[in-house]
Structures are given as C-alpha cells and as structure tokens.
Amino acid sequence: TATDSTTDLKFTNGAYWDLKGNSSVSDLTVGKGSVINMTADSSRYSNLQVDNLTATDGTFVMNAGSVDGGGSYSDKLVIDKTSAAGTNTIKLISTGGMEAAARNQAVLVKGAAADTKFAVSDSVYANGLYEFDLTLADKENNGKYDWFIGSLQKNTVDSVNTMVSANQVAYTAWIDGNGTLRQRLGELQSGADNGVWARMFGGKLGGDEFTNKYKTYQLGYDAQAGDWRVGAAYEYSDGSLNYTSGSGENKIGAVSLYGTLQGKDNSILDIVVKRGRIYGDVDVYGKYSDQGDYSTDATSIGVEYSKRFDGGNNVYFEPQAQLTFGRIDGYDYISNKGVKVAYDDLNSFIGRLGIVAGKAFSRGDVYVKASLLHEFSGNSSVTMLAANGESYSADKDYGDTWLEAGIGGNITLGKNCELYGDVERSFGGDVTKNWGANVGFRYSF
C-alpha cells in the first residue's frame, strides 16, 4: 500500500498494489498480470499521477459513478510525461451513478501516448437494477490522448425481471381461481336440497419467465332461498414457483358468496363475488441475488349464463357465456437489497364463450368442453428504486386471447352424494395452463 510520493515502482509477475488516496510516482512499470487497485479507498476517488508509464497487459481497477465534491466521476490515471506502447485493461467498480459518469464522459486516463491503449474488461454491476456494458473512447489533447467512457448500454438484471414476473404470477393465480359453475358444484340438480361440498383443483401454469405448480382447496355450503340457491365458500391456494433465475411461493386465501338461479327452460344464471388476499415471496439466485415478500387484496365478480339443449339419445349441448371482473389492489415492498418495488392496481375483465357437449347415463354423465377467453383489460405498471439511486419503470399489458379444452364427468354415489371432476388445458395464451385437474364432492341434505 502506498499513499505518498514514491520515486519508482515496478510490478511484475502478478504483483498487486492497493492504492489509497492520491499518489505520485516518477516511473511506474506494470507487467503482465499485475494489478493496480485504485478502489481501496471507497470514500473518495483517487488520482494516480505518473511521470513515465511502462505498462503491458496490466490491470487498473477504478471506481466510477456519481460525481464527488470535486467534480470527478471516477478514479484517474494521469501521465505527465511519457508512456510506452502497450495495451492494458481497466476494470470498473461502481456503487451507482454509472449513467451520470457516461453522460459526462468521465476521464479515466489522461495524457497517454498514441500507442498506449486501454479497454474495459467486464460489464459493471453496481448492486442495483442494471448491468452496464461499456466501451472506452480516446480523444487527442495536445498530442496526447485521454481515455474516457465513450458509450454505455444498460440491461436489467435477473432480479428485476423476476420481481416483475411476480406480479404476473399473482394475476394469473387469481384469475385461474375464477372457474365455472360446473367446476364448482358439478351437475347441479334443480330443486336440490341444502348441501355442503368440497373440491380440490390444481395444475401447472407457465409463462416466459416462470412456472407455477399449484393446488387449491375449497369448501362451501348452500341452501335454497326461493328460486335462488345461495351459498358461501372458503378457498386456500398454495403455489410453488420456478423463475428463470429463482424460486418462490404464492398463496391465496379467499371467501366467496354465490347465487344460482335455475330456470324451467334449462337455463342457469350464476353470480359469484369473491374477496381474498394474495401472499407471495421471490428468491433470486446467483450474481444478482435478492429476496422480497409481498401481499395484497383482490376482488372478483363473475356472472355466468348457460342453457342446455336436448340432442336426443341422452345427448345434450350447453352453450355458455361468462364475464368476470377482477381487481388486484396495488402494493409495494422493499427487498433485502433495499429495492423499493411498487405495483399499481391491476384491473381485469375477462369474457368467455364456451360449449359443453355431453351424454347422460342413469347415474351421471360425461362431457367434453371448449371455451374461448379474452382479457379486455389487464393493464398494470411497476416502478423500482434501488438503494444506489437506479430506477426502473414499465407498463405491462396482460390483455390476451386463449382457448381452453377439457373432459369431465359426474357420478351419483347415492341418494345424497355426488362426485364430479374434469381435466383441462389451455392453448395460445402468453401464459398457458399446461394441465389442470378438478375433483369435487357434494352432499345434499
């Protein structure tokens, strides 16, 4: 370590110098594999002033970023007299402010000869939201050359991409729980008695940045109230997430109220109102590791209408239409690295047109189904602010169109018991349901 004026210094065979503060050297030799570390004093930028430089295949490690009190944006190597031919590497370290350093063309080397060259060795990550790819440029100044940050390209790091994807996870998990009347209650019989029911459904959702394997448990009770069947249900969902560079969990607890009106013309109107809370966590691995936990409230209101037509020989057809409005309230959290993450409210409006074709038997039925769904809304925005001042914002549009298809059935186990279920998958959306399965049991009394 050196801090004061020194006459001659020679570093060869991988030698290492920790430079703290400013230093002046008459003759400095930096051989192959040797390192001059100018970042040992992290509280300020350092200047290394050299009369004569002889350097080939050496490395200069420098701080760069936000401006200091003296107007500097980086450490600096200043050559007062001569420099020998050679190519060397500059490795930049930053705790933030790289865009300001590039915008102000921070000078890293001043006074080099024309055949003394420098290049940046690696991209720069300042423990924030971006990784910066830099190139150096030189400009002639009174017969000598100054080397400065010439261009900068920034790329969001994995932690940003993963935390953005977490909002899409919350959205897809919430809308997947909407379901249909047939999935919730099976083949509901007109004039049936009061009943309790339970079902379990799960599946695997996949997008560009994540997969979500989930299972949901739902328990409900309903009773006849005039022409309407009214009921309530509670559900709990647990999802295990894999991101491109991380993992996480997603949980939902929700209460729903519903009313179902069965017409004498084989039509059914079903209205469901649901309110719940979404919980999640994100763990990002590797170089850009970070962790965050979040929670928010969500609401949905769904209206479904269907009507059954007799096709003869116990075959039936059932066109369906469904509209579901959903809202995920805005939320924010601070990650372990001090990144402030904030999501705006997300509104959803999904329309579904479907058809069920089935065949009834003495103790139940089997059917195939297909639906076309479209998200008419699904807009959201996210902002992030890192502890080092780097910021990120993006608007996300989850508007999409997709198909769902499946098979299912109902079976009567006794006078008061019914078992029902289905399997399905989706096609064509940005997020697909690779598979989904639903099984339920209803007891009437």
Model features per residue range: what roles?
Residues T1-A106, K110:
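Extracellular beta-strand/loop-rich repeat segments of large surface/secreted proteins
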Residues Y16, R182, G186-E187, K213, ...:
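Transmembrane beta-barrel domains of outer membrane proteins
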Residues T56, V61-V67, G71-Y73, T89-G226, ...:
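Outer-membrane translocation/initiation segment of Type V secreted surface proteins
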Residues T59, G191-A198, D227-G231, N266-V272, ...:
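Outer-membrane beta-barrel architecture
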Residues Q153-F317, E424, G429:
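Outer membrane beta-barrel translocator domains of Type V secretion systems
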Residues S159, K213, S240, T244-G246, ...:
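Solvent-exposed, glycine/polar-rich loop segments of beta-barrel outer-membrane systems
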Residues M200-L205, E235-S237, K274-G280, Q320-D332, ...:
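Short glycine-rich beta-strand segments
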Residues S256-L261, Y343-F445:
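Outer membrane beta-barrel transmembrane domains
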